[in-house]
From Swiss-Prot:
Similarity annotation: Belongs to the CemA family.
Keyword Transmembrane part of the UniProt annotation: yes
GO-annotated cellular components: chloroplast inner membrane
Stored Pfam families: CemA (PF03040)
Gene: cemA
Keywords annotated in UniProt: Antiport, Chloroplast, Hydrogen ion transport, Ion transport, Membrane, Plastid, Plastid inner membrane, Potassium, Potassium transport, Transmembrane, Transmembrane helix, Transport
GO biological process: potassium ion transport
Biological source species: Nuphar advena (Common spatterdock)
Reaction it catalyzes: K(+)(in) + H(+)(out) = K(+)(out) + H(+)(in)
InterPro entries referenced in this protein's UniProt entry, alphabetically: CemA (IPR004282)
HAMAP family registered for this protein in UniProt: CemA_PxcA (MF_01308)
Origin organism lineage: Eukaryota, Viridiplantae, Streptophyta, Embryophyta, Tracheophyta
MF (Gene Ontology): antiporter activity; proton transmembrane transporter activity
Protein name in UniProt: Potassium/proton antiporter CemA
Length: 229
């Protein structure tokens, strides 16, 4: 019975990692034709955020410039002008398609994220015993590691999250979050978050090292400070 319980957390952990992703991907693929059809046939209003509005305006400005060019070259042969008008018409259609596709992707990404959140919430509610077993397994695994490996792992993780190059990673993650949920990507807000998050994490880490690790494993704290120096 003990061996069975010890083996339970591994498949449970694998299901937490892969099952929400697989279900969300299947949900995304199955919903895409329906969302595309709904947006192209039933959507009567246009919702634009600042980034999308800017892109649409830039596209139409280019088309307007082509129309002005068309007016300037009326003395050209009729066949040349006809080709130019056909090209402008194709560009307009392509611009509308890109606009629609952006909105469809936002809806699908948002639905996928909600699905993942619902699945993980169900896991946390229905799999309480498995979570307890997984927590015990993780604690036992960490306990069996040497203090040197623990200190090196903490140092590596902190360098990745709050190190010198971490702002670039934070910008990518926050930008991806904004894109997935269709929010307006404000550079000032992102810059403020990138400047704030690492400082908060660094403060929490120092408090954890001082309050918890210094009491549980003083040797680990000594090794960590030695590696950090």
């Amino acid at each position: 019975m003990t061996k069975k319980k010890a083996l339970n957390p591994l498949p449970y952990l694998a299901s937490i990692v892969f099952l929400p992703w697989g279900i969300s991907l299947s949900f995304n693929k199955s919903m895409e034709p329906w969302v595309t059809n709904w947006w192209n046939t039933s959507q009567s209003e246009t919702f634009l955020n600042d980034i999308q509005e800017k892109n649409i305006l830039e596209g139409f400005i280019k088309l307007e410039e082509l129309f002005l060019l068309d007016e300037m070259i009326k003395e050209y042969p009729e066949t040349h002008i006809q080709k130019l008008r056909i090209g402008i018409h194709k560009e307009t259609i392509q611009l509308v398609r890109m606009h629609n596709q952006d909105h469809i992707h936002i809806i699908l990404h948002f639905s996928t994220n909600i699905t993942c959140f619902a699945i993980l919430s169900a896991y946390s509610i229905l799999g309480n015993e498995e979570l307890i077993a997984l927590n015990s397994w993780v604690q036992e695994f960490l306990y069996n590691l040497s203090d040197t490996i623990k200190a090196f792992s903490i140092l590596l993780l902190t360098d990745l999250c709050i190190g010198f190059h971490s702002p670039h990673a934070w910008e990518l993650m926050i930008g991806s979050f904004y894109k997935d949920f269709g929010f307006v990507q404000n550079d000032k807000i992102i810059s403020g978050l990138v400047s704030t998050f690492p400082v908060i994490l660094d403060t929490i880490l120092k408090y954890w090292i001082f309050h918890y690790l210094n009491r549980v494993s003083p040797s680990l704290v000594v090794i960590y400070h030695s590696l950090n120096e």
